Design a protein with these regions (language model features):
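Glycine-rich phosphate-binding loop and adjoining helix at the ATP-binding site
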Residues: 109, 113-213, 349-360
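Hydrophobic "anchor" residues
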Residues: 106, 163-164, 233-234
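Active-site glycine-centered loops adjacent to acidic/histidine catalytic or metal-binding residues
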Residues: 194, 220, 386
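Glycine-rich phosphate-binding loop of actin/hexokinase-like ATP-binding domains
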Residues: 211-268
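Short secondary-structure boundary segments
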Residues: 153, 219-221, 270, 340-341
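ATP-binding/phosphotransfer module of carbohydrate and carboxylate kinases, centering on a glycine-rich
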Residues: 1-64, 68-73, 77-113, 117-144, ...
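Short, acidic, Ser/Thr-enriched surface-loop or helix-capping motifs
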Residues: 101, 159, 228
Length: 423
């Protein structure tokens, strides 16, 4: 039987440093006293930790709090220039790459629009690599200052030694995306599902902030969720929890891109909405066929004058409400956040109807305790969520890394990085 691991003074110091840094990052600017109170650390411990974090360039003094006559206390926040992170949103026809400083302020953006209906893995790697190079050049930061790259993808992400993507709807079956990107960029890469990335961004900064039990919905071409349970992202046995778009809403119904019939995505996904409109109004003038977002916007805008648009959106509201009711009944969240470009577009005009439809299908008690709200971070929130992946890694390690910001790459080993032991 293996012996239990002994907690050392070094482990405790790293844990305390991480706790303090998390609080400053998410809730700063804070005083030292506030850091100690929320992190559960003594004044002496906080004083020593903050001195180290300031000396290491991770945290900065940013002025004094307003005083009511007592001695004003210094305010702390993370140092934006400590390092930089990159977030990537891999869509099915677009790749968005954004570079952020350590406080997650946007510094550069690059968008690639592909000319194929579904992005091949090799093409995706090429677009991501091109985008990374472009944003580093635009922001004029040294590559050595990049703490990491977080990549959000459609499909299931299996976290083995390296992340492997299973995107059944887009033909990505067992794609070793993390290894491919490490080889092409030489940077530390983290990969996660797009809905989970969106959920993390909304929980840190957006409409799910302050919740311990929430469901963040991503509606676009694909449909998925991020489930927050007791303050943690619920992943399941193989990190595939949350594939709400492939729950059955109509037995034997429309064929979904995954190959099954009756999936929710086949009724409320963007492609399904456009196809249903075309079925009811062949050759209708609801936007350009090549511009799916434009087509959806046109359908929403014409709902009062176009009977086909009104019928399509009425069906979407009903199915979406029923699907949200399932989430309410299954997970008992305090909040459901509707996000993704399609979710934002629909809820801007139709959220009251969606709430009403959800209430018609949900159990009374859990529905009486839930808020259904629109996401707050906009259409690029998935890339921001990708950027939170390397940030979370740094914060959880207490920013115990070598050099200025990032760990240093091991010579001759692309993508491998050294880490400095805790002080």
């Amino acid at each position: 039987m293996p012996r239990p691991r002994t907690t050392t003074v070094r482990d405790l110091r790293k844990s305390n440093r991480s706790s303090a840094l998390w609080q400053v990052f998410l809730n700063g600017p804070l005083t030292r006293q506030e850091v100690g109170a929320v992190a559960g650390l003594s004044p002496a411990t906080v004083s020593n930790l903050v001195a180290d974090l300031v000396a290491d360039g991770v945290v900065a003094e940013v002025g004094l709090e307003d005083s009511n006559g007592g001695r004003p206390r210094g305010l702390l926040q993370v140092n934006p220039g400590y390092g930089y992170v990159i977030g990537v949103d891999v869509g099915e026809t677009t790749v968005l790459v954004e570079l952020f400083d350590f406080s997650l302020q946007l510094r550069a953006r690059h968008t690639s629009v592909t000319d194929v209906s579904v992005l091949d893995p090799q093409d995706a790697v090429a677009h991501i690599t091109e985008g990374i190079q472009a944003v580093i050049a635009e922001a004029d930061v040294p590559e050595q200052a990049i703490l990491g790259v977080g990549v959000a993808v459609p499909g299931l992400v299996e976290h083995r030694e390296y992340a492997v993507v299973h995107g059944q709807s887009i033909g990505w079956l067992g794609v070793p995306l993390e290894e491919m990107l490490r080889a092409s960029t030489g940077l530390p890469i983290m990969v996660d599902n797009g809905a989970k990335s969106l959920g993390q961004a909304e929980r840190w900064f957006g409409a799910a902030r302050g919740t311990d039990n929430a469901v963040i919905v991503l509606l676009g071409v694909g449909v998925g969720t991020c489930i927050i349970s007791n303050g943690e992202v619920y992943r399941g046995a193989t990190s595939s929890a949350g594939e709400w778009g492939h729950t059955t809403i109509m037995a034997g119904g429309r064929t979904c891109r995954c190959g099954a019939r009756g999936c929710l995505e086949a009724y409320v996904g963007a492609g399904a909405i456009a196809a249903r409109y075309e079925e009811l109004s062949p050759g209708g003038a609801a936007g350009s066929p090549a511009d799916l977002e434009g087509r959806i916007a046109a359908i929403i805008a014409s709902r009062d004058s176009d009977p086909a648009a009104a019928q399509v959106l009425g069906e979407v509201v009903t199915y979406l409400g029923a699907g949200i009711a399932d989430l309410v009944n299954l997970f008992n969240p305090e909040r459901v956040v509707v996000g993704g470009w399609l979710g934002i577009a629909l809820s801007a005009e139709l959220l009251p109807g969606i709430r009403e439809a959800a209430g018609a299908h949900a159990l009374q008690l859990p529905f009486s305790c839930v808020e259904i709200v629109t996401a707050e971070l906009g259409q690029n929130a998935v890339a921001l969520g990708g950027a939170t992946l390397p940030i979370a890694t740094v914060l959880s390690a207490g920013a115990v890394l070598t050099g200025h910001g990032p760990a240093r790459r091991v010579p001759g080993q692309p993508g491998r990085w050294t880490a400095q032991a805790a002080r």
